[in-house]
A protein has these predicted regions:
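NAD(P)H dinucleotide-binding glycine-rich loop of Rossmann-like/cofactor-binding domains
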Residues: 174-269
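Low-complexity proline/serine/threonine-rich segments in eukaryotic and viral proteins
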Residues: 14-69
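Short beta-strand element of Class I
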Residues: 288-291
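Conserved acidic E/D residue at the C-terminus of a beta-strand in Rossmann-like folds
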Residues: 294
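Glycine-rich beta-strand-centered segment in the early N-terminal region that forms part
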Residues: 94, 98-121, 130-181, 186, ...
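Glycine-rich cofactor phosphate-binding loops and adjacent beta1-alpha1 units
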Residues: 258-260, 285, 301, 306-407, ...
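N-terminal Rossmann-fold NAD(P) dinucleotide-binding loop
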Residues: 275-276
Length: 475
């Protein structure tokens, strides 16, 4: 179905949604229509049905008339490309355009912008794909943690301006569907033809080009982008602000939904970047004690560097026993799973993958009536799963224990927009030091393959790619 040029009007029927001046008819679960060619027209009977008083005029209008588009030179665009199990490479890739492709058709994306990528981070979720634990196809451009400068804007972008430095939520969202309007931007219904929810450079998340690159296109820019209020201030704190696209909101979401508040005792499973971000977020929320569990001593040392207690999950002592040694109690108020489906066993089983381990442990160590946050990634299709059940996301959970203890659980993607503005203000006004907490380590785009390899070996670092040398120049 096409689109037509029409200024916004109040009190039109509920079936009509506005896409920055492009009037879009709703009715199916497909991605929103993209501006059609000038020859496309709405059928007269459909126009008459929805706009009986104005249908003669509307039906004669062409859809989305063509305008000249200013292009920005990006002939040196490069990106991190997944080549197959364990392999990534930095390769030349196509320049981004203000276009969307759907079912073989390419149309203009007037609501989008093109960003010069200032920083883009390697995420543990990327590692799941690189390890071959998803159905990601070779040739995919990776990267969903993006901060950049606007260098080109579509004609329907009203509030984001050229030169703005912006954080890009990893969730791609339309801003118009029910989920977006209710704040659940992680499961937008209009940006992925196969399932709710989309992300840049991630398997099964809509086919959007990733942002571990020099330039990237962002749709629905006025809705999706968080523009930093002051350019110089943003560049001075860019190592912290780059964490707003994913891991800081994701860690905060895990702690917040678990119920962390003033005086809480908290257990965080996993001392990777998301776990460390969650621990720091728990401190920001007022937790009295934050305990972080992991098997890599370097990562545990990083957690201790900003005031966390730690437990080594390679030891034979039970997790409740280790928590009791710290708190004098075997249970905490809140627990957060920041590990996900590649979890390993405890103690003697620490070298064996047991994907339900963390979920069962957090239920065990959370007090009656407590809360559990689960930002750790779980999938429905794992080619490398330990058994047939795990390969389809079916795990052996002690759900009866969770029920008996009246625990509340929150799972799923973090809706980044729910938290990123507040966390930005906390960064800009020196209320937190997220880059220090996660040990942000800047490397060049060309060094991304080595960053992936080091991260896979358990490095206690959050690798931040610097495609244009902006971060190196500001250090």
């Amino acid at each position: 179905m096409g689109t037509i040029e029409e200024p916004f009007r109040p009190n039109l029927p509920n079936q009509v949604a506005f896409d920055h001046g492009l009037l879009t008819l709703q009715g199916d679960r497909s991605p929103p229509p993209i501006a059609a060619s000038p020859s496309d027209r709405l059928p007269l009977d459909l126009v008459t049905l929805i706009f009986p008083s104005t249908s003669p005029r509307l039906s004669s209008l062409p859809l989305a008339p063509s305008f000249p588009t200013r292009r920005v030179s990006m002939s040196d665009n490069k990106g991190v490309v997944y080549l197959g199990d364990g392999k990534v490479d930095v390769q030349s890739i196509d320049d981004p355009k203000l276009e969307l492709s759907y079912r073989g058709k390419t149309r203009q994306c007037h609501h989008g912008v093109i960003l010069k990528v200032i920083s883009t981070n390697i995420c543990g979720s990327d590692q799941h794909m690189v390890r071959g634990r998803t159905t990601a196809p070779a040739g995919m451009v990776l990267g969903h943690e993006i901060t950049g400068e606007v260098v080109e804007a579509g004609r329907d972008v009203e509030f984001i301006k050229k030169g703005d430095i912006c954080s890009v939520p990893f969730n791609i969202a339309c801003g118009r569907c029910r989920c977006c309007k209710e704040g659940d931007t992680g499961v937008c219904e209009n940006v992925n033809p196969d399932r709710p929810g989309a992300a840049y450079g991630y398997v099964d998340m809509g086919g959007w080009i990733g942002g571990q690159s020099r330039y990237v296109m962002v749709p629905y820019a006025d809705w999706n982008l968080l523009a930093f209020p002051d350019r110089d201030q943003a560049l001075a704190k860019i190592r912290d602000l780059t964490m707003l696209s994913d891991i800081f909101p994701t860690g905060y979401h895990g702690a917040y939904t678990a119920g962390v508040t003033t005086g809480s005792t908290v257990y965080v499973a996993g001392a990777g970047p998301v776990g460390l971000a969650c621990a720091h977020a728990a401190q920001l929320l007022g937790a009295a004690v934050v305990i972080v569990g992991d098997m890599v001593e370097e990562r545990l040392a990083q957690a201790r560097s900003f005031g966390c207690e730690t437990v080594d999950l390679k030891t034979e002592a039970s997790l409740p026993d280790m928590i009791e040694q710290i708190l004098g109690s075997r249970e905490v108020d809140c627990a957060v799973d920041c590990v996900g489906f590649e979890a390993r066993g405890h103690g003697g089983d620490s070298g064996v993958e047991k994907p339900a381990t963390v979920l069962n442990q957090v239920m065990e160590v959370t007090r009656v009536g407590g809360g559990v946050g689960i930002p750790g990634l779980y999938v429905t299709d794992d080619p490398g799963g330990v058994d047939e059940a795990a390969r389809t996301g079916n795990l052996s959970l002690r759900i009866g224990l969770g029920w008996a203890k009246s625990l509340h659980f929150t799972t799923g993607q973090c809706p980044v927009m729910k938290y990123n503005r507040g966390l930005m203000m906390a960064i800009l006004h020196d209320r937190c030091q997220i880059a220090k907490a996660v040990n942000a380590t800047v490397i060049s785009l060309e060094d991304a393959p080595q960053g992936y390899a080091d991260f896979d070996q358990g490095a206690a670092k959050k690798f931040v790619l610097d495609p244009h040398g902006v971060l190196a120049a500001s250090s």
